[in-house]
Amino acid sequence: MERHQHLLSEYQQILTLSEQMLMLATVENWNTLVDLEMTYLKAVENTANITISSCTSPVLQELLRQKLRSILENEIEIKRLLQRRLDKLSELVGQSTRQQAVNRTYGQFPDQALLLGETQ
C-alpha cells in the first residue's frame, strides 16, 4: 500500500508541475516555463520507472488514469500556447528581415540625399 501511495504522490507531483507550466504559458513567462520543464521531465522519467512495477490495483489504476487525463489536457493546452508564441516570434522575425532589407536598400544612398519635399 505504501508503494501505491508513493506512486500516487509521484503522479500528483507531475500534475502539479504541469499545472504550473500551464499557468506560466498562459501568462507568457517563457523563461521560467523552460526552466520548470527540466524538473517536469525528470519527474516524468522517475515516475515511469516506478509505474512499470507498481500498477496492479484497479482502484490505483483509475486514480492514475484521472491524473494522466488532466496532465495530457494540460500538455495539449501548453503546446497550443507555445505554438501561438512560435507563430508570433516567426512574424517578428519576418518583420525584422523585411526591415533589414529596407534599411540595406535605403542605406545605399549617399548621406546627403534629399528627403522627399526638401529643396536644394
Curated annotation (Swiss-Prot):
Oligomeric and partner information: Homodimer. Interacts with FliD and FlhC.
Disulfide bonds: none
Ranges where the record places region FliD binding: 60-98
GO cellular component, one term: cytosol
Gene this protein is translated from: fliT
Superkingdom assignment: Bacteria
Acyltransferase listed as a keyword: no
Protein's name according to its UniProt entry: Flagellar protein FliT
Species assigned in the record: Yersinia pestis (strain Pestoides F)
Keywords: Bacterial flagellum biogenesis, Chaperone, Cytoplasm, Repressor, Transcription, Transcription regulation
Function per UniProt: Dual-function protein that regulates the transcription of class 2 flagellar operons and that also acts as an export chaperone for the filament-capping protein FliD. As a transcriptional regulator, acts as an anti-FlhDC factor; it directly binds FlhC, thus inhibiting the binding of the FlhC/FlhD complex to class 2 promoters, resulting in decreased expression of class 2 flagellar operons. As a chaperone, effects FliD transition to the membrane by preventing its premature polymerization, and by directing it to the export apparatus.
Region described as Required for homodimerization: spans on this chain: 1-50
Annotated localization: Cytoplasm, Cytosol
Keyword Transmembrane attached: no
UniProt similarity note: Belongs to the FliT family.
A Gene Ontology biological process term: negative regulation of bacterial-type flagellum assembly
